[in-house]
Amino acid sequence: MNRKYYFNNMWWGWVTGGYMLYMSWDYEFKYRLLFWCISLCGMVLYPVAKWYIEDTALKFTRPDFWNSGFFADTPGKMGLLAVYTGTVFILSLPLSMIYILSVIIKRLSVR
């Protein structure tokens, strides 16, 4: 992942995180502060998780698979993209931590 990829994909993380914060702003619930902290982390780590999911998916499939069949440009694809964006946002914190730990372990094992 490079800086250009991060900045091109960070907007969806900010939009999704902003929506989550906006929807929970007026509600009082027990873990509100924790929810806000996780949402803020998700906003920042969204591009890392998206890259990790795409990289993992492309290890098992070819790029042309994602442009044909079920994933062709149809109205149903928009719903699938919304579910994908939500899933990446929810998984951004755990996947980013897994990615960061794997990079650290690889670098330490090379030495």
Swiss-Prot record:
Enumerate the UniProt keywords alphabetically. Bacteriocin immunity, Cell membrane, Membrane, Plasmid, Transmembrane, Transmembrane helix
Any Pfam family matching the protein: Microcin
What is this protein's name?
A: Colicin-Ia immunity protein
Q: Which InterPro entries match?
A: Microcin
Q: Which BP terms in the Gene Ontology apply to this protein?
A: bacteriocin immunity
The regions listed as transmembrane in this protein's record are 33-53, 85-105
Where is the signal peptide, in residue numbers? none
Role according to the record: This protein is able to protect a cell, which harbors the plasmid ColIa-CA53 encoding colicin Ia, against colicin Ia.
Q: Where in the cell is it found?
A: Cell membrane
